[in-house]
Amino acid sequence: MIEVVAELSRGPVFLAGEALECVVTVTNPLPPTATSASSEALAWASAQIHCQFHASESRVALPPPDSSQPDVQPDSQTVFLPHRGERGQCILSTPPKILFCDLRLDPGESKSYSYSEVLPTEGPPSFRGQSVKYVYKLTIGCQRVNSPITLLRVPLRVLVLTGLQDVHFPQDEAVAPSSPFLEEDDSGKKDSWLAELAGERLMAATSCRSLHLYNISDGRGKVGTFGIFKSVYRLGEDVVGTLNLGEGTVACLQFSVSLQTEERVQPEYQRRRGTGVAPSVSHVTHARHQESCLHTTRTSFSLPIPLCSTPGFCTAIVSLKWRLHFEFVTSREPGLVLLPPLEQPEPATWTGPEQVPVDTFSWDLPIKVLPTSPTLVSYAAPGPSTSSITI
């Protein structure tokens, strides 16, 4: 029996363009009750990163597969296919790297191997929606002699920051070590430089604050004014807004605001049913605030953006956008007053009206959500960093 353990050194969350580092440990455990044990051998082990794409058949109409592409023996158990047995299709993969060949371990012996690969920047982010799913995995394949291949899959989460794929790593003294006697690995230097560049771009895009005011009106007049200080956010930030109802001419009885994502299938991939079109848009609510606001002149709200959510993106098949969805309940009666008089000549009982004629309307405000530091996401929303399998 051989135990294979794969451990991600920095957690399972990465930014596209970063280098993934994984330590693969192969052990021939010594049974505590065994009186004798024999050595174990593996013919080889290889590792590869791939992105698996799956679409809902009821929502997405995909074109037929290209028959001109060669088939690499998908049914053979001796061919290393990292996506073997998974639903959907592999849309992105890195070149496979061999970890070792002809490994023999004595009882109780263990050996470790380091795997490093740069995550492609041309792929989509990790996403699990109602119409499509993009799932990244690191797959390690091991094989004994004259035996089928055994696959160990390590789930990954990949965040994509648009524009980094067009940036080239500088090869001048600007990124050279400060001391000529200190050597730094090129891959580590490039990885840290890319992380710093991504952090600078995210900070520049989300730190700009400027008050934006929006007049909210229905068909009968002004309801209020909504104010927000910025429209670009990072994962983990709070969306803060204010609502001024004191200037309105239409009484607002209640309002709610929801932080939502809108997943939309591109028109050319929408599933058509007879003469109609299948649902191509789905909404997910991540946070919500509701308030009864009669006689309220000014109020505010704060909606957190979950770290486990996906920033906005767009591919040839689907797009994901963020928005604030408002719903207002207003009174049809002009000058509605539901407070008791200040002076009562004699004792009286005051009750609110049993029925109030109302109107409802909604309003959507688009916002932009960008990724954040992968290290922050790993700490705040931890996922499994270690996977193991027994051969």
Swiss-Prot record:
GO term, biological process aspect, one: retrograde transport, endosome to Golgi
Pfam families: Rgp1 (PF08737)
GO-annotated molecular function: guanyl-nucleotide exchange factor activity; small GTPase binding
UniProt KW Chaperone keyword: no
Keyword Membrane: yes
Subunit structure and binding partners: Forms a complex with RIC1; the interaction enhances RAB6A GTPase activity. Interacts with RIC1. Interacts with RAB6A; the interaction is direct with a preference for RAB6A-GDP. Interacts with RAB33B.
Protein's name in the database: RAB6A-GEF complex partner protein 2
Lineage: Eukaryota, Metazoa, Chordata, Craniata, Vertebrata
Gene: Rgp1
